[in-house]
């Protein structure tokens, strides 16, 4: 999870988040290269006293500054499109977790496991136990098995919310009257935190998301 003063991304806990971090590093390398080149050219031009009034065209230069940016855009676009399609992929055999946004809490259902609605409210700061996190802990955490595909379906009962779990690489709008879906695959057991990522009213900051990933056997025992 995020910590105070953190300068990098959260540790990835799913394959799709690993892919996102790789694309981030790929894009940053290209951007740093462009920034360095433009900065060096700008400094050189500031100190360059040579000029010419007879040169009206430079075919080679014009060709280069047309082809190179186009090549860089393609170099960015191809992995971006691949990642975009990966985000939309979902397993037909994945466990369905339905998240319903309310002002200002979440409720969850797991139809395939016969789990009825679970309301998940933020634990007030005065009720936190030692070691628990302010504004992130909830009274009821939905449990999912790690190492298996999870298909999350998000909707809302009132206004627009957004269900986000950064370490899993998941963020999607929860819109009234509409079902949005994304999948994730937890690589490791643990508790993963997120928050509503769409301003939804006065208590928008107080509707956290907490998901617990456990072993498959433990998950089956909990459902039974």
From Swiss-Prot:
Compartmental location: Mitochondrion inner membrane
Mitochondrial matrix-side segments: 49-62
Binding site residues for Cu cation A2: 196, 198, 200, 204
GO cellular component: mitochondrial inner membrane
Enzyme class: translocase
Residue sites binding Mg(2+) per the record: 198
Gene Ontology terms describing biological process: ATP synthesis coupled electron transport
Keywords attached to this entry: Copper, Electron transport, Magnesium, Membrane, Metal-binding, Mitochondrion, Mitochondrion inner membrane, Respiratory chain, Translocase, Transmembrane, Transmembrane helix, Transport
Regions annotated as coiled coil: none
Membrane topology per record: Multi-pass membrane protein
Catalysis: reaction(s): 4 Fe(II)-[cytochrome c] + O2 + 8 H(+)(in) = 4 Fe(III)-[cytochrome c] + 2 H2O + 4 H(+)(out)
Bilayer-crossing regions: 27-48, 63-82
The protein's required cofactors: Cu cation
Family: Belongs to the cytochrome c oxidase subunit 2 family.
Function statement: Component of the cytochrome c oxidase, the last enzyme in the mitochondrial electron transport chain which drives oxidative phosphorylation. The respiratory chain contains 3 multisubunit complexes succinate dehydrogenase (complex II, CII), ubiquinol-cytochrome c oxidoreductase (cytochrome b-c1 complex, complex III, CIII) and cytochrome c oxidase (complex IV, CIV), that cooperate to transfer electrons derived from NADH and succinate to molecular oxygen, creating an electrochemical gradient over the inner membrane that drives transmembrane transport and the ATP synthase.
Name of protein: Cytochrome c oxidase subunit 2
Taxonomic lineage of the native organism: Eukaryota, Metazoa, Spiralia, Lophotrochozoa, Mollusca
Gene: COII
């Amino acid at each position: 999870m995020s910590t105070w003063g953190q300068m990098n991304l959260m540790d990835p806990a799913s394959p799709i988040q690993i892919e996102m971090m790789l694309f981030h590093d790929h894009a940053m390398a290209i951007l740093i290269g462009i920034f360095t080149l433009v900065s060096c050219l700008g400094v050189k031009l500031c100190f360059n006293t040579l000029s010419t009034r007879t040169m009206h065209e430079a075919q080679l230069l014009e060709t280069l500054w047309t082809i190179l940016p186009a090549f860089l855009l393609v170099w960015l676009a191809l992995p971006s499109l691949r990642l975009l399609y990966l985000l939309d992929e979902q397993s037909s055999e994945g466990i369905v977790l339905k998240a319903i946004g309310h002002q200002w809490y979440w409720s969850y259902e797991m139809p395939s496991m016969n789990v009825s609605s679970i309301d998940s409210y933020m634990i007030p700061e005065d009720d936190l136990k030692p070691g628990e996190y302010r504004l992130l802990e909830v009274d009821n955490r939905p449990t999912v098995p790690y190492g298996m595909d999870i298909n999350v379906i998000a909707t809302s009962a009132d206004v627009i919310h957004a269900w986000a779990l950064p370490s899993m690489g998941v963020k999607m709008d929860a819109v009234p009257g509409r079902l949005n879906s994304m999948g994730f695959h937890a690589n490791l057991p643990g508790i993963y935190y997120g928050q509503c990522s769409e301003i939804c009213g006065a208590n928008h900051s107080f509707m956290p998301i907490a998901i617990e990933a456990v072993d498959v056997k433990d998950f089956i025992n909990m459902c039974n």
